[in-house]
Amino acid sequence: MSIEDIIKNEDILDCWKEIQKSNSDKNISKGIFEYDIEEYHTFLLDEIVEASEYMNMSTDTLINEMLLFTKDNKSLVINFSNERLNKKIPFSSPLSYEELSNGYTEEELDIAYQDLENETDAIIDIGTLLTYLIDLIFLFKEEKSYKKYLTEKLCYSEIHAKEFIEYEKNIIENL
């Protein structure tokens, strides 16, 4: 399976259209992608491959899980995504540059901490939905691996990883 299989899936596209409608006030992509397609597909596939490794499942299995989860839980996927886009994560302390940049240095990104922290114009596209789906699969199927993924892959501190998981669980409980 490929990224194209995911983004052309009717259930995924239905969710994406609803998220677009609900967030018209944000910098949301009018199409599916705003970036160089080939490069972005590679990035998204890498995200899925890495997440699947933390879940101890094949990439194809994770993709199938994402598609089935979306098919069976469309309203949850839409509502969870809308909440994530509209609620600030209540961390107990500011994130470090490493946490904000998922492990990249300021030199590698050539973006100052303040600019990275204040990034409110990030373009929201279908890739955002796919990352939220990965989060949901972790929460519902592989919660024990989620904290490890957040600390190792996304470079969150132990405290921030725990707070992030609680934040997402609270969203689900309140839907």
Per-region residue spans from a language model:
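Short Lys/Arg-rich basic patches
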Residues: 3-42, 87-97
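Intrinsically disordered, low-complexity coil/linker segments enriched for acidic/polar
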Residues: 9-13, 58, 103-105, 142-145, ...
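Charged, low-complexity interaction regions
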Residues: 29, 54-56, 122-124, 140
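Amphipathic alpha-helical segments in structured regions that serve as interaction surfaces
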Residues: 40-47, 108-113, 142-151, 161-171
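Surface-exposed, Lys/Arg-rich phosphate-binding patches that contact polyanionic backbones
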Residues: 41-55, 61, 65, 113-120
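Short amphipathic alpha-helical segments
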Residues: 57-67, 125-134
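Repeat-associated, polar segments at repeat-unit boundaries in modular proteins
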Residues: 58, 66-81, 168-172
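Short, positively charged interaction helices/loops
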Residues: 73-93, 157
